[in-house]
Amino acid sequence: MTEVMELNDADRALKARHRAIWAMGDYDAVATQVIPALGPVLVDGTGINPGDRVLDVAAGSGNASLPAARAGARVVASDLTPELLDHGRQHAASEGLEIDWHEGDAEALPYEDGSFDVTMSLVGIMFAPHHQASADELVRVTRPGGRIGLISWTPEG
């Protein structure tokens, strides 16, 4: 096996562990207690307008996707963990919001270059193992002149 293959195998194993960890707890309950006010802050900060095509990366259960959809944006929510997306679908359905929910890896987003006016992540993408690869993907899928917005914490807190 080559070093590249070992790295890919290690990455796949790490992402599988991440997916399992996020799926085992009650992330949705924690998120609705800890970060509910941050979604509207991110939506306002990125200047999301009606009709904007928005990608929420590492969307979880939709803490930023839902306020973006309420603002009239066409939202795609992507996350590594399907169980979290299921919670988001339920929240969106209860409000009559249309959001496209897709399982996806922040380091290899399944979207064409320049597909989105706004790409954002609310306390999500920071958990991806390879930050540079994730940042490169955010830039790639955001149209030239588009906006990227993140809310994350730093190692210092």
Please report, for each region that a protein language model flagged, where it lies by residue.
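N-terminal, positively charged/glycine-rich alpha-helical extensions of SAM-dependent methyltransferases
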Residues: 1-23
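Class I SAM-dependent methyltransferase SAM/SAH-binding core
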Residues: 53-108, 133
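Conserved alpha-helix/loop element of class I SAM-dependent methyltransferases that forms part
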Residues: 32-52
